[in-house]
Amino acid sequence: MNVFWFIPTHGDSRYLGTAEGARAADYDYFRQVAVAADTLGYDGVLLPTGRSCEDAWVVASSLIPATKRLKFLVAIRPGLSSPGLSARMASTFDRLSGGRLLINVVTGGDSAELEGDGLFADHDTRYALTDDFLHIWRKLLAESHENGSVDFDGEHLRAKGGKLLYPPIQHPHPPLWFGGSSPAAHAIAADHIETYLTWGEPPAAVAKKIADIRARAAERGREIRFGIRLHVIVRETEEEAWRDADRLISRLDDDTIARAQQAFAKMDSEGQRRMAALHGGKRGSRQELEIYPNLWAGVGLVRGGAGTALVGNPEQVAARMREYAALGIETFILSGYPHLEESYRFAELVFPLVKGGDARRAGPLSGPFGEVVGNGYLPKVSQS
């Protein structure tokens, strides 16, 4: 089981929908979160993309020297940059980071934002363009290891004599990750992607996605891995966890929720539509927002994209993770508010349950020990 964390380049806070409890989203803070994730034993970090975020490539590049083993899941944007430029960026990053790059292919689901960035294309056209883009991108990086060139004549993109002089460390290219819930998105995943990402829907819905994509990939003679994107609120007791879930949205008012839901409704993203359907745009009670045991839809009231959280004590959260893992999920990309403190909390409480075979995560060897007791004794590993 792989566990990733998240760099909050679109802001961070103790509460959703208010400036109260917010903290500066700057390099010093991003670095703190990245170093924490690296030190605690997370396998990688996701950096979000879009106009609401700092640029993912610039931020990720700045964090390379601050980290030792952490992998970076960074977006390429078909239609907003060329496949050749994106391939060069990926190869350079992979080389400078020592092979620590993962690529998140983001087609985009907000037409207004995309048009603001200069891309005027409907939903299916964007996915057709993504298909052309990935054919060129993959070939450029693969051919770079043999000093080859690429010619491609697609419906939306063409390349003639395309060449990449400096190959990436990873062969044939940094692994491709991708998420999308429409049939067009599933076809892209089956054709090109190494790891398909789903947002945190209930297990039955996730299982249905996995089955469809596996079947499509098998028809093409391919196998695909799967990951899931979730928030997490884990505490020593279930009562504490639900109390903090309620606290996270305690500053939300109906107007803020309505404005957020109106913005999401204008998108043509099937995934965003499915997220919104989980809560219906209404605040509701804890019972109404708990859409499956320990799966809470409160975050999605005002946050676009991933809108559900695992909520509970360590054993409950670990049990839900194992339930998803039994469906085929290998990677969990998690986040929590605020991201620095929650990275420690999750690692301390849940890693011993889901990473028990990994000594680096499972418990103290050379440390950490906690504060020395009585100036001469190390604390016990557990207190009863």
Swiss-Prot record:
Transmembrane segments in this chain: where? none
Is the keyword Repressor in the record? no
For the protein in the UniProt heading, the enzyme class is oxidoreductase
Query: Which InterPro entries does the UniProt record give?
Result: Alkanesulphonate_mOase_FMN-dep, Luciferase-like_dom, Luciferase-like_sf, SsuD_RutA_monooxygenase
Tell me the GO molecular function terms.
alkanesulfonate monooxygenase activity
Task: Describe the task this protein carries out.
Answer: Catalyzes the desulfonation of aliphatic sulfonates.
Q: Which domain of life is it from?
A: Bacteria
> What is any one GO biological process for this UniProt entry?
alkanesulfonate catabolic process
Q: What HAMAP family does the record point to? A: Alkanesulf_monooxygen
Catalytic activity entry: an alkanesulfonate + FMNH2 + O2 = an aldehyde + FMN + sulfite + H2O + 2 H(+)
According to UniProt, the name of this protein is Alkanesulfonate monooxygenase
- What EC number(s) does this enzyme carry? 1.14.14.5
- A Pfam family of the record is Bac_luciferase
| Family to which this protein belongs | Belongs to the SsuD family.
- Which key words tag this protein in UniProt? Flavoprotein, FMN, Monooxygenase, Oxidoreductase
